Structure formats: C-alpha cells, structure tokens
Design a protein with these regions (language model features):
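Enzymes that bind and transform nitrogen-containing heteroaromatic metabolites
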Residues: 2-28, 44, 88, 156, ...
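Generic alpha-helical secondary-structure signal
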Residues: 13, 63, 95, 167-170, ...
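Zn2+-dependent cytidine deaminase-like catalytic core
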Residues: 35-143, 147-163, 281-284, 336-338
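Helix-turn-helix
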Residues: 32
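Proteins enriched for Cys/Gly/acidic motifs involved in redox and nucleic-acid/cofactor modification
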Residues: 23-27, 52-53, 120, 134, ...
C-alpha cells in the first residue's frame, strides 16, 4: 500500500510541525505528528517538546483527548518512527497502541539503536497497519533491517519514493549524524568578502555583512545544540556568540577550545545567558578553578599539535547529546577542522565587497594536487539582504547520510 494523496498531505503537515522543534527538542530529534480519522477529520497534532517533555505523538494524543475525540480506528502520521524504549518519557509506540490507533504512517525509521525498527515491529505485532516511506529503511540499523525483513511485504507497506524520509533526515542531520557516526553534524559559519577575506589585516571585521545576514546567522545558532569557537577568537574579539537577534526558547551550549586555559575571567564568553563549556588540555590548576568560579564547566581532554584533540571534542559533545554543532571561529581553527575532515557543512555569507589584503577563511595547505582539496557540493544559494548565503555540504558527509544532491 503506497502513500495516498492524504498520506502525503498529512506527512507534509507533520514535517511542518517538526520544524517547530528546532532549537527546542535537543538532544531528541525534531518530530511532528498528526492524528486524523479515516474520513479526514483531524483529531490532534503536536511536535516534540524540550528534553524530558512529551514527544510529538504524546502531544497529539493529549490534544485529541483534551478535545474529547475518540481515537480508536484513527491514523497517526509521524515524521520519525515512534520510540520503543523507556528514556525520560515512556515509549510512544505503546501510547499509540493503548489509544487504539489503527494505522501509523512513518516518514523514516529511527537511527537510534535503542529504537531502529523496534517501534515499528511492536506496532505491527499489535495489529496496527504500518506504512513507511520507501527510502527510510536504507542503511539504518541491523535491528531495523531485521524488523523489516521479518515482515511480509504486504504488512510492511511501501513507499512514496523516499521524499519524506529524506526530508526527515534533512531536518535531523545532527541526530542522524550522532546516532550513525558518534559525532555531531558540524556546520562551519564564515562571513567573508567576495575575495574571501574575513577581516582587514589588523583584524577589523565589524561588519563585513549586513544586518539581515547577521540576524540569519543567529537563526542558525539557535538551531544548534552548541556553538563552538577557539581561544584566539575570544582573545581577539571578545565575542558572546549567544542568540540575541532572533527569539529562542533556550540558549545553546557555548563551547570554547582553550588548551592552556587562557580565557580571562572578564571575557564576555563567560557571561550569561546560557551554559559554557571550556575544553582544555592541561594548564594551570588555579586558572581552572577561576574559570569554574565564573560558572564555566572545564573539561580536560587529550592534547594534539596546536591545541585540544578535535576528534575527542566531537566525541565528548556527542556523549553530551549535542546533535548540531555550529562553529564560528578564526582562520586557524577553521583550517584545522577542514584538514581533519570534520566539517560537514559550510555556511558562508558573502558580502558584495572587496577587501584586497586581509585575513583568509582557512589558510591550510599547500595541497599537492587539486584532487586533495576537500570536496563540497553547493546545496543552496540565497540572497539575504545585500549579501549571499551559500550552503555547501561535504560530499563524504552527504554520501554517508544518503543526502547527495541539491536540496
């Protein structure tokens, strides 16, 4: 049974709801749910709330019950497989079963190994018809593959061609990255002139881009679980790198790489709002105590040439539940991340200016051949005020998540 026109319409609605979880649901994925009767009467809808709060399915069920609706025999459209494990909240698949839902339409299998097909299997075992978008099961987990393989084709349902599975992955790049690769999706933001300069030779950079681009940059900060920079940027610019120019339900974690713990106690980085995490590789114990006294968490990780081990940083952030990592740093850290192959996506704002001499985006190399250059594909080019916003995705990252090609 393929996605009907109604399924497609309702799944688009569920995905639109899921977008409202941006900046809210981390570390949980962004999920939307719509529940309606067979004749098209909507009973309830919702999206995943803050961690520890209800998931999308629970919100939709509660809304339907609050309106006095009978749920038995209804269909639920969910953008990600209902969870099957006890975490901070009970399993969503059990809630759907208990409510008497007769049919569940899912855009994507959950990449979380604690779920990975188990939610779908439990729904089917309860006699619920389950329809999954065709590309959703590609390359997820062994549990998901086994759950699908063990079901007769007629019970599994079929696809709408993968459109909604892809949309769910796009919306949850960080969650899929953390579940599949054990590290966040790293997005490197850079504002530069047309000739690739991020500042004048003396470091002056305020402001290369216009107000609209700066506001848009804050929206990208908001969607991330953490914003990361390096000690060089703090010492040179004393930034805050919090979310101020757009509304936000919470401030992302601000992460600073400071191998020798040189952050001054007066740094605006340490000021509220929002939590602060500083990664060091040793340093003076008194400085560590001083930073902790300012409210920062200090985590010591293995050192590497030039600073903290970047792979260890990403692994630790993943363990803390960070899905998307937004980086705004200087040329040295930019280059280190690119050379290490850790940049999944470039968020580049280009201003219609030429600076001539100045600071580069990421001075690494020299490369032996052009084939050695990090490979990116343009996925989006859009005008933001007077500036251009360019999104470019690392080819290897896109291939890993099955997201090749333009959006």
């Amino acid at each position: 049974m393929v996605f009907s026109d109604t399924d497609r319409q309702r799944m688009r609605q569920a995905l639109a709801l899921a977008e409202r979880s941006i900046g809210l649901s981390e570390p949980n994925p962004r999920v939307g749910c719509v529940i309606a009767t067979a004749d098209g009467r909507e009973l309830g809808s919702g999206f995943t709330q803050q961690a520890g709060g209800p998931h999308a399915e629970a919100v939709a069920l509660a809304a339907a019950r609050a309106a006095g609706h009978e749920l038995r025999g209804a269909t639920a459209w969910v953008s990600l497989e209902p969870c099957a494990h006890h975490g901070r909240t009970p399993p969503c698949c059990d809630a759907l079963i208990a409510a008497g839902i007769a049919r569940v339409v899912v855009a994507s299998v959950d990449p979380n190994p604690l779920v990975g097909g188990q939610g779908l299997a439990r729904l089917r075992a309860a006699g619920i018809e389950v329809v999954v978008d065709g590309a959703a099961a590609d390359g997820v987990t062994e549990n998901a593959a086994k759950a699908s393989a063990d079901e007769p084709a007629a019970r599994r349902g079929s696809s709408s061609g993968g459109e909604f599975a892809r949309a769910t992955r796009e919306l949850n790049l960080g969650f899929f990255s953390r579940m599949r690769r054990g590290r966040p999706w790293l997005r490197l933001k850079v504002a530069a002139s047309l000739d690739g300069r991020t500042a004048l030779p003396d470091g002056a950079s305020q402001w290369i881009t216009g107000e609209a681009a700066r506001r848009d940059g804050h929206a990208w900060r908001r969607r991330a679980g953490a914003v990361l920079s390096g000690i060089g940027t703090v010492l040179a610019d004393d930034p805050r790198l919090d979310v101020r120019l757009v509304p936000t339900p919470r401030q992302p974690l601000r992460v600073l790489l400071d191998s020798a713990l040189r952050t001054p106690s007066s740094a605006r980085w340490l000021a509220p709002p929002g939590p602060v995490l500083i990664y060091g590789a040793g340093g003076d114990a008194a400085r560590e105590r001083a930073l902790r006294a300012c409210g920062a968490e200090v985590a010591l990780l293995p050192g590497a040439p030039g600073g903290v081990d970047l792979h260890a940083v990403l692994a630790d952030l993943a363990a803390r539940g960070i899905n998307e990592l937004h980086v705004e740093a200087g040329a040295t850290l930019n280059a280190a991340l690119l050379q290490a192959g850790l940049v999944d996506e470039l968020l580049l704002y280009l201003a219609p200016k030429l600076l001539g001499q100045g600071l580069d985006i990421a001075p690494f190399g020299p490369l032996a051949t052009l084939a050695d250059a990090p490979a990116f594909d343009f996925t989006q080019v859009e005008r933001i005020g007077a500036d251009l916003r360019i999104l470019a995705r690392a080819r290897a990252s896109a291939q890993f998540l099955g997201l090749e090609g333009p959006l």
